[in-house]
Structures are given as C-alpha cells and as structure tokens.
Amino acid sequence: MHCPFCGANDTKVIDSRLVAEGEQVRRRRECVACGERFTTFETAELVLPRLIKQDGTRQPFDEEKLRAGMQRALEKRPVSVERLEAALAHIKSRLRATGEREVKSLVVGEMVMAELRKLDEVAYIRFASVYRRFQDLDEFREEIDRLAREPARE
C-alpha cells in the first residue's frame, strides 16, 4: 500500500485486529521509507445483483428504495427500526446467496412480502395491495383469507 505521507510503495503491517463485530479489519501500518504510521480499514465488497424490471430494463439494486417501500408499508405500525433493518439484511443476504448477477424484480418483491408478513400482517396487506395491484375489496378479502389460512414461514 502506498504511504499517504510520502507516496512510497513499501509499507508494513505492524498490527491487525477485527472491528465492527468482525465485519472489518483495522490495520496499523508503518512506511518503510519515512517511518510515518497510519491506519487502514478493510471490508469485504459484497455486490448485490442487478434487477431486471418487468419491462425488461435493468437497474442496480437500490437499498434505499427497498427501505422506503417497506417503511411506507410499516408506517404507524408497532415494528422497531431494528426489526426492519434485520429484514432488509435478510433480503440482501438471500439475494447475494443466489449467486446471480441479475435477478427479476419479482423475486425481490416476493422476498419483501415474506419479510413483511413475518413483521406485521397489516403492513403485509398494505404492501400486497400495491404490489399486486388490488382492484377491489374482493381481492383484499382473498388475501386476508389466505393470510389467515397459511401461517407465515420463518
């Protein structure tokens, strides 16, 4: 690694330790040329797949868009931010686990529905009504009946 002080190419690691609950490595380095010390942090780069929209267009995964959609469904519901963040982390983990470079947005939508169903049934119905484009009360009733018949999968 280049020294940020003198630009020399040769630095040595004098200490390494895990930080951020094991998600990051902190390294103390020393420049062989000038003797200055500095700290670097390493994290794994975890790339999420691109999304294939229903119209065939492709776009990068947008965590903020996902969070906003789930927050909208959970608005004024008794679900903590921690539980929402855990659900988001679970969705991202499942997407990475597919090993695919691209996934259909429908797959992500179904993952969101499954997570919302575990978090809060009212939020699930709110999201489902928009996601599945309910047209009338009968479609709401059918989804509520399905919710009552089929327990949420953990």
Swiss-Prot record:
Q: Which cofactor does it need?
A: Zn(2+)
Give one Pfam family, short name only.
Answer: Zn_ribbon_NrdR
Q: Which GO terms describe its biological process?
A: negative regulation of DNA-templated transcription
Mapped zinc finger ranges (unnamed): 3-34
One function term, GO molecular function aspect: DNA binding
What does this protein's record comment on cofactor binding? Binds 1 zinc ion.
Sorted keywords for this record are: ATP-binding, DNA-binding, Metal-binding, Nucleotide-binding, Repressor, Transcription, Transcription regulation, Zinc, Zinc-finger
| Residues in ATP-cone domain copies | 49-139
InterPro entries xref list: ATP-cone_dom (IPR005144), NrdR-like_N (IPR055173), RNR_NrdR-like (IPR003796)
**Task of the protein:** Negatively regulates transcription of bacterial ribonucleotide reductase nrd genes and operons by binding to NrdR-boxes.
Concerning its family, UniProt says:
Belongs to the NrdR family.
Among PANTHER family, the record links this protein to: TRANSCRIPTIONAL REPRESSOR NRDR (PTHR30455:SF2)
This chain belongs to which protein, by name?
Transcriptional repressor NrdR
Q: Which species is the source of this protein?
A: Pseudomonas putida (strain GB-1)
* Source lineage: Bacteria, Pseudomonadati, Pseudomonadota, Gammaproteobacteria, Pseudomonadales
